[in-house]
Regions:
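Accessory beta-strand-rich segments of carbohydrate-active enzymes
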Residues: 1-4, 18, 26-29, 34, ...
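Short glycine/proline/serine/threonine-rich loop/turn segments at secondary-structure transition edges
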Residues: 81-85, 124-128, 237-251
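Extracellular recognition modules
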Residues: 132-134, 253-257
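Short beta-strand edge segments in extracellular beta-sheet folds
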Residues: 162, 223-225, 272-276
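Short, solvent-exposed loop/linker segments at the N-terminal edge
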Residues: 176-185
Length: 333
C-alpha cells in the first residue's frame, strides 16, 4: 500500500513498461500476489494468513500489508457519442477501487458483486482517453464479504463505457404475479427516466408486452413533460398467460420505450417477464399454488484457471449440469 504509485492517473505517466494483465481476471491468478483460502476468518489476521494482526479491528485493515493493483488503459471514444450522456460501468471489482478518467476522479466502489456506474459526460472527450483504476485488496468492506471461498482481488467482471440520449431511461420495475385463483396474470410496470436536455419538450413513456411469437398482448403509454421522472402505469390483467415454473419456464418480452410525440423512438430496452406467484402457506413453499421442494446448489463463480472470472460458456455448462440433475434453486455466494 505504501509503495503504490500515487500519480498513476496523470497523463504524464509512462505506463509502457508496466506488465499487461487480462481483464476481467484476478491478479493473484496471473502471477501478482498470493491467493488465500480461509473459511470464516479474515485473511488479514493471523487466523487467516497475515502475520501482522492477531485479531480483527473493524473497520480498520492493515496498512503495512495491503496489496494494491493499478491499471491504465487508453481508448478512443466513438465519434457518434456527441450530445449523449456517457457512463462508466464496472460490473464487479473485488477490493476498494478508485476510478479516474483523463486524470480526474470519477468515483469509488467497494462491493465486489454490485455494478458501480458513474456519469462521465463532462470528463470523457473526443479522441484519446485514459482510464486509470487503483484497487486496494483490503478495506472495511472485507468485514462484510468474509465468506468460505478463495480470497483473491481485482477486476472480476466487465468494465465498459456506454452512451444514452439526454432523455433516457434510468430504471424500471416489473411485477407479474398471478391472481388469487392462479389463473390470470397481473402486470405492474413502473418506469423511471431523466431529461438532461435542458428543454421541457413533451415525450411519451410506454411499454409493450409480447408473446414468444412477438405478438402484442398488452400495452400502455402516457405523455410526460417538465421535471417528471417516473410513471407508474395502471396494473393490467393478462388473461390466462402461460405460467412460469422451473419445469415450464415460459417467458414474455417487455419492451419499455421513450418516444417523441410523432412516434420517433428516443430510447428503448427490453427484458424477459414470467408470470408466477411464489409464497409460503402453512409452512409450505408454493409456486403458482403448487408445493415444491427446493433442490439447490451454492454457486461461487469460481474457476481454477481464471479465479472469480467465469466465462459465459462455462456458465452455460453449469446451468446445463444443474438442469440435468433437476436443480431448481441456485444460491449465489
Amino acid at each position: 500500500f505504501a509503495d503504490r504509485p500515487t500519480d498513476f492517473m496523470m497523463d504524464r505517466v509512462d505506463a509502457s513498461r508496466w506488465p499487461d494483465i487480462n481483464v476481467p481476471g484476478n491478479w493473484e491468478l496471473q502471477g501478482f500476489g498470493t491467493p488465500i483460502y480461509v473459511n470464516h476468518p479474515y485473511e488479514f489476521c493471523s487466523s487467516g494468513y497475515s502475520p501482522y494482526w492477531d485479531k480483527p479491528n473493524p473497520p480498520y485493515v492493515p496498512q503495512e500489508w495491503n496489496p494494491t493493483g493499478t491499471y491504465r488503459r487508453e481508448f478512443t471514444l466513438p465519434g457518434d457519442w456527441d450530445d449523449k450522456e456517457i457512463f462508466l460501468s464496472a460490473d464487479g471489482v473485488r477490493g476498494a477501487a478508485f476510478y479516474y478518467l483523463n486524470g480526474k476522479f470519477v468515483g469509488m466502489s467497494k462491493d465486489a458483486k454490485t455494478p458501480a456506474r458513474f456519469n462521465v459526460s463532462t470528463i470523457a472527450k473526443k479522441g484519446k482517453n485514459v482510464i486509470a483504476i487503483q484497487i486496494h485488496r483490503f478495506s472495511d468492506a472485507n468485514y462484510l464479504e468474509c465468506q468460505d471461498f478463495w480470497r483473491i482481488s481485482g477486476i472480476e467482471r466487465d468494465i465498459y463505457l456506454y452512451a444514452q440520449p439526454q432523455i433516457h431511461l434510468t430504471d424500471f420495475k416489473v411485477e407479474s404475479p398471478l391472481d388469487e385463483n392462479y389463473r390470470n396474470g397481473i402486470l405492474k410496470v413502473k418506469v423511471q427516466f431523466t431529461n438532461e436536455s435542458g428543454q421541457n419538450s413533451p415525450f411519451v413513456v410506454g411499454y409493450r408486452l409480447l408473446d414468444k411469437n412477438d405478438q402484442q398482448i398488452a400495452q400502455s403509454s402516457t405523455q410526460v413533460s417538465g421535471d417528471q421522472t417516473e410513471v407508474e402505469f395502471t396494473k393490467k390483467t393478462i388473461q390466462e398467460p402461460l405460467q412460469w415454473t422451473a419445469e415450464t419456464p415460459n417467458l414474455y418480452t417487455l419492451v419499455v420505450s421513450l418516444k417523441r410525440p410523432n412516434g420517433d423512438v428516443i430510447e428503448a430496452t427490453s427484458c424477459k417477464v414470467g408470470f408466477r406467484t411464489v409464497e409460503i402457506k402453512d409452512k409450505q413453499l408454493l409456486v403458482n399454488g403448487q408445493p415444491i421442494l427446493v433442490k439447490g446448489v451454492n454457486y461461487h463463480e469460481h474457476n481454477e484457471n481464471t479465479g472469480h472470472y467465469v466465462s459465459e460458456e462455462l456458465m452455460k455448462k453449469d446451468f446445463e449440469l444443474w438442469k440435468r440433475y433437476n436443480v431448481n434453486t441456485v444460491r449465489t455466494c
